[in-house]
Amino acid sequence: MRLFVGLGNPGAKYARNRHNIGFMAVDEIARRHGFSPWRRRFQGETSEGALGTERVILLKPTTYMNDSGRSVQEAAGFFKIAPGDVTVFHDELELPPGKVRVKVGGGIAGHNGLRSISAHIGNDYRRVRLGIGHPGVKELVHGHVLSDFAKADNDWVATLCDAVAEHAALIAKGTDATFANRVHLAMQAKGFLTKDDNGKE
């Protein structure tokens, strides 16, 4: 069994924020693969289904970003899911818009959602880093992540979430490099990434 966690903030006010791209990704996984209706539990919302041969629980913590770890710990504990079987989908400032990287363990790069999760379950979970780009200076970061994607961004955001959902079974299977490459090729096919980009860490 796998636990896929999308990070974001709850409520319509935040729904299209850059910080919420993790929510957007798991919403698309649920939609594309016919997962169960979302239900409220574990200080969040869950949906259940299968990706390939793996049973997968999707989780969107509704604790607000900075306390996401409480929800993740509760869900992982209930289902007896080890940190190595937890995958977190989150926004990544240090990657250009639309680029994806997958890593297991490591630092949190200043991401408060990851900080909370690491404090509750340790560092040994998988992260799917969804590039949103950096505003250029540190002082603008807070406003950048908590503002909505521009209309001009809608096409690449939709393409990215669609590609992540289409190839999500590869993450469930543990073939991270193949997943990242397939997502990269899907983005490249729509003209959103250049040929020298790749999805490897």
UniProtKB/Swiss-Prot annotation:
EC id: 3.1.1.29
Enzyme type, top EC level: hydrolase
A Gene Ontology biological process term: protein quality control for misfolded or incompletely synthesized proteins
Site feature location: Discriminates between blocked and unblocked aminoacyl-tRNA: N9
Function in brief: Hydrolyzes ribosome-free peptidyl-tRNAs (with 1 or more amino acids incorporated), which drop off the ribosome during protein synthesis, or as a result of ribosome stalling.
Species annotation: Bradyrhizobium diazoefficiens (strain JCM 10833 / BCRC 13528 / IAM 13628 / NBRC 14792 / USDA 110)
UniProt cross-references to SUPFAM superfamilies, sorted A to Z: Peptidyl-tRNA hydrolase-like
Subunit and partners: Monomer.
Catalytic reactions on record: an N-acyl-L-alpha-aminoacyl-tRNA + H2O = an N-acyl-L-amino acid + a tRNA + H(+)
Membrane-spanning residues: none
The UniProt record lists the keyword Secreted: no
Any one GO molecular-function label of the UniProt entry: tRNA binding
Places the protein is found: Cytoplasm
Annotated tRNA binding sites: Y14, Y64, N66, N112
PANTHER family xref list: PEPTIDYL-TRNA HYDROLASE
Cellular-component GO terms for this entry: cytoplasm
Disulfide bond annotation, renumbered to this chain: none
Encoding gene per record: pth
Protein name: Peptidyl-tRNA hydrolase
Site feature (Stabilizes the basic form of H active site to accept a proton) residues: D91
Keywords: Cytoplasm, Hydrolase, RNA-binding, tRNA-binding
